[in-house]
A protein has these predicted regions:
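N-terminal beta1-alpha1-beta2 submodule of the flavodoxin-like/Rossmannoid cofactor-binding fold
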Residues: 1-78, 88-90, 95, 99, ...
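Short, glycine-/small-residue-rich phosphate/pyrophosphate-handling segment
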Residues: 109-146
Length: 159
């Protein structure tokens, strides 16, 4: 049986809730991807062209710094990476996370939360950050998703 990690970034707490439920449902370790400089409410105002999140998402090379690295990443074979959908893709801090480790031979499975967007071009944007890893198609969940639905999703992945 492979060792699993649920790593997640959550700006508002919604993705954190889904990540915690997923980790419990599949018996995985959990790790919060925290930005070195926390996002403020103003930073997250997607309607403001000068907001930090808008600037980051409009720059494909943007890599926001992460506060803490996971020391034992080499111990994991399967990594579920959770995030809110921003501009129809993963926030660029997810690229920072993936590029911070040697992912060779690992299986990466994105999962996301959104108020109405689907997974969009998330995998297309994440693939260059997953060198040497197997990147599976991601899925968007509502904040109300339960253990049973998450466990069934993971079972369906046939890991």
């Amino acid at each position: 049986m492979s060792k699993k990690l649920v790593a997640y970034f959550s700006a508002s707490g919604v993705t954190a809730k889904v990540a915690e439920t997923l980790a419990e449902a599949i018996g995985a370790d959990i790790f919060e991807i925290e930005p070195k400089v926390p996002y403020t409410e103003a930073d997250l105002n997607w309607m403001d062209k000068k907001a930090r999140s808008t600037i980051e998402m409009n720059d494909p090379a943007s890599r926001p710094e992460i506060a803490i690295k996971r020391d034992n990443m080499k111990d994991y074979d399967t990594i579920f990476v959770g995030f809110p959908i921003w501009w129809y893709v993963a926030p660029t801090i997810i690229n920072t996370f993936l590029e911070s480790y040697d992912m060779t031979g690992k299986t990466i499975i994105p999962f996301a939360t959104s108020g109405g967007s689907d997974i969009g071009k998330t995998n297309e944007r994440l693939a260059p950050s997953c060198k040497g890893a197997k990147l599976l198609e991601g899925k968007v969940f509502k904040s109300s998703v339960g253990h049973k639905e998450l466990a069934a999703w993971v079972d369906g992945l046939k890991l």
